[in-house]
């Protein structure tokens, strides 16, 4: 989600952008992520996106941070520049919630992407306040965490109303031996 959102913002002509992503392109990313090509496997996603965005808009001022966001570096990141808007596409709960909380605390506009894994019906994608979402485990977990942090403010999110297909979930390990969930989609001939 992050790569697609960032590219659309770049194509819209934004003048400055910060890209934060410490991941490298993996073969399992090719089915869904913008920077993932056979020629980019093993490269930093942030560097691949930066080169792409400079090719789209040579005048864009990019700040590229190949780091994982953690509680400790999020305030520093948000205080290092004047941000008009934050697009959150983090899929790990703790840094996602902390980025949301710190952005709201600083009155920085933010939109957050919720879970779409094991879902395939694009007609069920919605834009709503996080407090109005349903059938989304990530939204529920984020709401709980925000409540613990005392945050009950509105937060625009993109989510899916579709219930996840448990048959489409596979547990695997990534390059750092962290457990990952992979999602499969039905082939076009299997969808009705």
Feature-to-residue mapping (PLM):
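Short amphipathic alpha-helix with an adjacent loop that forms part of the alpha/beta core around
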Residues: 73-81
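Conserved SAM/SAH-binding loop
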Residues: 66-73
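Glycine-rich phosphate-binding loop and adjoining beta1-alpha1-beta2 segment
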Residues: 24-56
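Conserved S-adenosyl-L-methionine
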Residues: 11-16
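Single conserved hydrophobic/aromatic residue that forms the stacking wall/gate
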Residues: 183-192
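Glycine-rich adenosine-cofactor-binding loop
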Residues: 1-10
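ADP-ribose/adenylate-binding Rossmann-like module
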Residues: 85-90, 102-125
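A charged, well-structured terminal subsegment
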Residues: 143-159, 164-174
